[in-house]
Amino acid sequence: MRNRRKFHDFSPDVFMPSITIEHIAYVQIWLLDFSGFFCSFVANMDRKTFFENELLRCADVVSRGGVIAYPTDTVWGIGCDSSDSGSVEKVFAIKRRSDAKALISLVADEEMLEAVVGPLSAEIRELVRSDRPTTVIFEHPRGLAPEMLAADGSAAIRMTREPFSQQLCRRLGRPLGATSAKINGEPTPARFSDISGEILDAVDYVAGYGRDEAEPHAPSRIVKIAAGGELVFIRK
């Protein structure tokens, strides 16, 4: 019968090899790499959670007829439900302007845009897909509050690609009213820090996302679809 060595008969070196300084250094490097990855992972999760929470808060306020200040694909804006007359009138009151100058409606994608204005021509698709924010004035849109329309029944609509405003439109499932976050006649704020305290106090909620954006933004270009489908650039 073969002799079987008992567990305690083996030399400790079999199970506990010599640990060198190099081994310790490798472990330290690995731990540093892992801790850096873990911290980055947690930070990304925190940012994602913050983004989602702000979306939920803004969507809740807007869906209940409230008015928000929020980042858009151009300058910071005052927003509301484009289909709700009462909400639109609140925006006019905050900006101290009459309803003679209608608001812009933001949409999340081409599908939402076509639900409001009907099928898009190839030329219009090219415009709204442009990297540069482009507001298009459409004739006789559907589903918008009367206060969102100009005197001739047209409406200014822009497809946003900015993450927050785009996802907010999707959460609402309909266009989001937008106008610059300023009192009528005052300069347009290029950053959040440029918005007056009066505006921030007047809205029902101010989005926390995007406040630290340092780079200034400019207004969009504006294109009107004239009779016969001709495109007229109002602001380039």
Specify the residue positions occupied by each region the protein language model found.
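Active-site-adjacent structural elements in enzyme catalytic cores
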Residues: A43-K236
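Short hydrophobic alpha-helical segments enriched in small aliphatic residues
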Residues: D9, V14, I24-V27
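Basic polycationic patches enriched in arginine
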Residues: R2-R5, R47
